[in-house]
Amino acid sequence: MGLGKILIAVAFAATAAVGGAADSVMRRQADGFLQALPDGLQQTQTLAVEKAIAGDNAALMAVRNSRNMRQTLSENVSVRQLSESLRLYEPSGVDGRLPLLVYFHGGGWTFGGLNSCARFCDAVAAMGGVKVLAVDYRLAPEHPFPCGLHDCCDAVAYARDNAALLGIDASRISAGGDSSGGNLALAVALSDECRGALESLVLFYPVTKAFADGSESWRKYGSGYGLDADLMEAFNRAYLGGTDSENHAVSVGLCSGEQLRRLPRTLLVAAGRDILRDQGCELAEKSGGRIERVEFPDAVHLFITVPGQDEAFRKAVDLTYEFITQKQ
């Protein structure tokens, strides 16, 4: 069975078997996840980002510290801290040069780090046939666009130039990320610096437009579903600095179909009840089939980095591993 058919089958299974019924596992877990979120969390984070934009980052530092908890890792995964900003996850007891996933964490470009994406990176590496390089890029608003993007491009270049040291196959480097990290992965793939360096992309509910898009999902899920519109707009302002929001390096969704067809083969996994859902859907449609899109209809934002939506997380890990290890 070809990869496209495999992904279609998985998408159908996610919709029909675990995503279609109102009492599905994904829906029950997502609803429980939302109910467990502290009251006022989104408003607190929005205010913290807005204060940081104005020059007072004390509240944002508190948010960053709260998202920087060490994670318990799998016994069959070893971790190498290559530098302050690069952490390599390697499956134990596997010989030969493996494919590599270079992963960019989410957090609205303003918080998150190596620890916030550790659970996902560890889970992918634990599958046994992929190494994962997590990247701690500079954060906004202290370091607005293009600082974080430059750091991510540098990480891909480092992996490409040090394949022997890392024990990877330089021809099978992929990049990925969730939310704002997915935005960075897209921009890296289309950058002149990394053109041709990536074999594939794996994206989870990526930001593809750094502005309020007014779509159906933006209106319907803009409050109470894990990422509120006010917080997303604060993230956008922080990252943009003085950059035009229609710059294609921050709003890849504005690229033409011809430009998007320059992407490596891409898997986009969407949450059905997410403010960013329609951005990703439009991007996939515009790509002319370059982007394979899978939707978990009952999931909400954050299933990659914040525990609570275990079924969506597990399926995302499985899809990632299958996509990256699929030989072309």
Language-model regions, residue ranges each:
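A glycine/proline-hinged amphipathic helix-loop "lid/cap" segment
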Residues: G2-P91, S245, Q328
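Hydrolase active-site cap/lid region
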Residues: L190-T243
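Catalytic active-site module of serine/aspartate enzymes centered on a nucleophile-bearing elbow/loop
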Residues: P307-Q328
